[in-house]
A protein has these predicted regions:
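Sec-dependent bacterial lipoprotein signal peptides
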Residues: 1-21
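Glycan-association/targeting regions that enable binding to alpha-glucans and other polysaccharides
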Residues: 20-128
């Protein structure tokens, strides 16, 4: 059995690592949008992470619709928000999508790759 005095630092370290690795993906895309003549719809997302080892300049965001991935760009003034336009065929009324973030983090000897996926969301396209 572990000595409580020796196990306390280990417990604190694991609690600290879990707290520092928290990531939140917030969908900023409305759930309903009017149909657009050009078929391009805006998608936006916010990423917040407390992971200390995260290499912030390495983050790449995507909107994933089916098997297609649409790259997103960071918004100019807010470094934790991304946006893009996604084409939706005129015959579709519902788009099921999720967000994907690829990024690097600092490992013990070098950088390592990781990825996070959001839950699924739906966009309802309303006819005018």
């Amino acid at each position: 059995m572990l000595n409580p005095t020796k196990s306390l630092p280990l417990l604190l370290l694991s609690w600290w690592l879990v707290g520092c690795g928290t990531t939140a993906i917030t969908n900023l895309t409305p759930s309903r949008l009017p149909r657009k003549d050009n078929g391009q719809y805006p998608f936006a997302v916010e990423w917040n992470s407390r992971q200390q080892s995260l290499v912030k300049d390495s983050i790449k965001a995507y909107v994933v619709v089916g098997l297609d991935q649409y790259p997103m760009q960071r918004t100019p003034m807010l470094t934790n928000r991304w946006e893009t336009l996604v084409p939706v065929p005129a015959d579709k009324n519902i788009v099921t999508y999720r967000y994907k973030f690829d990024y690097e983090y600092l490992g013990f000897a070098n950088r390592k790759l990781d990825s996070k996926l959001s839950k699924y969301y739906q966009l309802f396209i309303l006819d005018k």
